[in-house]
Amino acid sequence: MFGPLTLEGAHVRLEPLNLDHVPALVEAASEDRSNYQWVYTPAGPEQMTAYVQDALTKVASGDHVAFATVRKGGGPSGSDLVVGCTRFCEIFVWQWPPGATHQRRGVPDVVDIGFTWLSGPAQRTPVNTEAKLLMMTHAFETWKVHRVALQTDVRNTRSRAAIERIGGRLDGIMRADRPGADDTVRTSARFSIVVSEWPKVKARLTARLAAGTTRPLSPS
């Protein structure tokens, strides 16, 4: 188990996903369905409940750490507003040879960031940039992972360009990788950032936030 975790910045709070978030997530996902061409985003209470329950099953097994993405001050009268989801997934603890210098206990060696979606109004805001900064900072500086990976539909040229802009490197194309959000068999573009690259990536993300740059960075 690697959670539950709460990660908080100036614009966003990532809090442990639970079934109480379902009504707010349904509302967030209903605002503009055209935003979800490349990432599966449940529609309606039944689908959203099943989605969250599946996430919680993966959390309980230690495979995922799932968050509700909360935009601070994004709701009526400056209240906080649930605007989407994201996760640590593909969490692996490597089996090192006995006595290996890199052997650690209780933390992962590599992780993915995925299952990311946001409401339409939360896109092109600092929310996703800060969420990625919070998650990568935790992964590299608290867990001290060797690699963070991100992937997106190979056709999602906008997200691919955004990942490359912050320093993600294309590791390869995974053919027939998973179900696509558009009822196709998805081919994925897989990117990674390794620990030696993290300082430059962190600086780029921090600069994007400071400059108010809000180009999309939402792999899944």
How would you name each of these model-derived features?
Residues 124-138, 161:
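Conserved acetyl-CoA-binding loop-helix of GNAT-fold acetyltransferases
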Residues 112, 130, 147-149, 158, ...:
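Amphipathic alpha-helical recognition patches that constitute DNA-binding helices
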